[in-house]
Amino acid sequence: MKTPRAYASAAVLPNGEFWITGGASRSNVLRTTEILSIRNEEWTIRNGPKMPRALIGHCFAVMSENELVIAGGYSPIEDDYSQNVDIYDMGRGKWYTKPWIPMIKNGPRIDSSCINFLFGTERRVVIAGGWNNTAMEVTEYLDPNLQMWVTMGRNYSQGEPQQQVGFLSTF
């Protein structure tokens, strides 16, 4: 990477590019994106689109062939958990917030994991776990047809003690 960063989020796009978004450098929180690609067995790094806001601990996933999604995270500038769901339109080359998407149903969070997952014949962005003043045990998916986040379940069995685990990671 060109910029050292921690608490960033990354995803592999259908074209094989590896996008790294946000995070914290040695001196500040970032809203930059770096794109790594390998061609002819050689890594190249280029700058990607700037995010709408600087975030750490957000999740980033492919939503469709033409859209990427950022959900959650923490904004030190706003000194709060992010209430936003930002969509990057690859065809238009810009970020926007869909007005119909409320923040994650069970509350904003940092350090969650999200991934694009096949539900029957449709793909959904699934977000799991994370932290909002306590470890979160809920898993949700974004349903663009219903225009909302849908709770899939909790990450513990009824009657068993709740595990306080917050920091998940996927790749």
Locate the predicted segments by residue:
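Kelch-like beta-propeller repeat domains
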Residues: M1-F171
